[in-house]
């Protein structure tokens, strides 16, 4: 054990973070990352018969076909892919005017009505019937998700 009188003050250093391996060569790091990305893209290209750089299908074991995104919610559509589909990009069939108009307004109204009906039902609320939405949720326990079961242990009776 050390004595309290043996305590030496630690010299104050301005930097806590130390460069242990020398300065970073950003050009070499970029080349390494580009080489790794090119290797991953080549492996994916051979595996899936699809060129992910140009986004074109290749000949091979898989047959790729275009799926229109009319049935998908807008959350799943990236802004770039939606504009390319609408504009009819390279090697893609042009879209008709009916497809560019989007969903019919009556479909949108029916969807919003069904959503409001679901949210107004109190028995579907997380706190159960009769609880207000403003309250905090209680802490969940393991038995909320799994039913507790008694384990049967068979043993011989003592005579």
UniProtKB/Swiss-Prot annotation:
Species for this entry: Mus musculus
Subunit structure as annotated in this protein's UniProt entry: Interacts with HDAC1; the interaction is prevented by competitive binding of C10orf90/FATS to HDAC1 facilitating acetylation and protein stabilization of CDKN1A/p21. Interacts with MKRN1. Interacts with PSMA3. Interacts with PCNA. Component of the ternary complex, cyclin D-CDK4-CDKN1A. Interacts (via its N-terminal domain) with CDK4; the interaction promotes the assembly of the cyclin D-CDK4 complex, its nuclear translocation and promotes the cyclin D-dependent enzyme activity of CDK4.
Domain comment in the entry: The C-terminal is required for nuclear localization of the cyclin D-CDK4 complex.
Ranges of biased composition (kind: Basic and acidic residues): 82-93
UniProt cross-link Glycyl serine ester (Ser-Gly) (interchain with G-Cter in ubiquitin), position: 2
Residue ranges of the region described as Required for binding cyclins: 17-24
GO cellular component: cyclin-dependent protein kinase holoenzyme complex; cytoplasm; cytosol; nuclear body; nucleolus; nucleoplasm; nucleus; PCNA-p21 complex
Phosphothreonine modifications at: 140
Stretches assigned to coiled coil: none
Pfam family membership, one: CDI
Tissue specificity remark: Expressed in keratinocytes (at protein level).
Span list, region Required for binding CDKs: 53-58
Entry's localization field: Cytoplasm; Nucleus
Protein name: Cyclin-dependent kinase inhibitor 1
Known role: May be involved in p53/TP53 mediated inhibition of cellular proliferation in response to DNA damage. Binds to and inhibits cyclin-dependent kinase activity, preventing phosphorylation of critical cyclin-dependent kinase substrates and blocking cell cycle progression. Functions in the nuclear localization and assembly of cyclin D-CDK4 complex and promotes its kinase activity towards RB1. At higher stoichiometric ratios, inhibits the kinase activity of the cyclin D-CDK4 complex. Inhibits DNA synthesis by DNA polymerase delta by competing with POLD3 for PCNA binding. Plays an important role in controlling cell cycle progression and DNA damage-induced G2 arrest. Involved in p53/TP53 mediated inhibition of cellular proliferation in response to DNA damage. Also involved in p53-independent DNA damage-induced G2 arrest mediated by CREB3L1 in astrocytes and osteoblasts. Binds to and inhibits cyclin-dependent kinase activity, preventing phosphorylation of critical cyclin-dependent kinase substrates and blocking cell cycle progression. Functions in the nuclear localization and assembly of cyclin D-CDK4 complex and promotes its kinase activity towards RB1.
Residue span of motif PIP-box K+4 motif: 135-159
Any one GO MF annotation of this record: cyclin-dependent protein kinase activating kinase activity
């Amino acid at each position: 054990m050390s004595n309290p009188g043996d305590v030496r003050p630690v010299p104050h250093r301005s930097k806590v973070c130390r460069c242990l391996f020398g300065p970073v060569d950003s050009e070499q790091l970029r080349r390494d990352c580009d080489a790794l990305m090119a290797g991953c893209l080549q492996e994916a290209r051979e595996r899936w018969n699809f060129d992910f750089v140009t986004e074109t299908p290749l000949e091979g074991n898989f047959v790729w076909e275009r799926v229109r995104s009319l049935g998908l919610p807008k959350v799943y559509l990236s802004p770039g892919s939606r504009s390319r589909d609408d504009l009819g990009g390279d090697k893609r069939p042009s879209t008709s005017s009916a497809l560019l108009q989007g969903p019919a307004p009556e479909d949108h109204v029916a969807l919003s009505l069904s959503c409001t009906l679901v949210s107004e039902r109190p028995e579907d609320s997380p706190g159960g019937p009769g609880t207000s939405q403003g309250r905090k949720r209680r802490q969940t326990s393991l038995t909320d998700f799994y039913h507790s079961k008694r384990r049967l242990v068979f043993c011989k009776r003592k005579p």
